[in-house]
Design a protein with these regions (language model features):
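Vicinal oxygen chelate
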Residues: 2-27, 35-131, 138-144
Length: 144
């Protein structure tokens, strides 16, 4: 692997730079609505939102969730990017307080799929599915 790859953005990187290692780029129906929902459910901070096109779609929404970038786009089937429902993955959200993050997500409209609980591997863990079909896994330290 190259020595030039780094997790953190280099010093002097402009505001709005991508934060984190691997960044999820989700194709959802209603990317701007999804971004608004993530503000409520996951305390997302908008970094950049491309204006919608004449059909109400946007090609790019950049958010920060818990200090890391998450990106969204509407499907553009005419450009080879059709809508495909989320399946076979979850977004892991490492947090200090699993219960409060999970509860905020559920209160905002996520479906509870696994209540917060202390797991055999040593973490506290919970899951919820958002209205756009994405499963979120909150993980953090066990309750004291």
């Amino acid at each position: 692997m190259s020595d030039t790859l780094t997790k953190e953005a280099p010093a002097g990187t402009p505001e709005g730079a991508i934060k984190g290692g691997i960044v999820a780029y989700l194709s959802v129906e209603g990317a701007i609505r999804c971004g608004d929902f993530y503000k409520k459910a996951f305390a997302a901070q908008p970094v950049h939102i491309n204006p919608p096109d004449e059909q109400g779609r946007t090609m790019h929404v950049h958010l920060l969730i818990n200090g890391n970038s998450v990106m969204l786009s509407d499907p553009y089937p005419e450009h080879g990017c059709p809508y495909v429902p989320a399946a076979g993955f979850s977004l892991m959200l490492p947090v200090a307080n699993v219960d409060s993050w999970w509860q905020r997500a559920v209160d905002a409209g996520c479906t509870a799929t696994m209540q917060p609980q202390d797991m055999f591997w040593g973490d506290r863990y919970a899951q919820a599915k958002d209205p756009f079909g994405v499963t979120w896994a909150c993980v953090g330290p066990k309750k004291a």
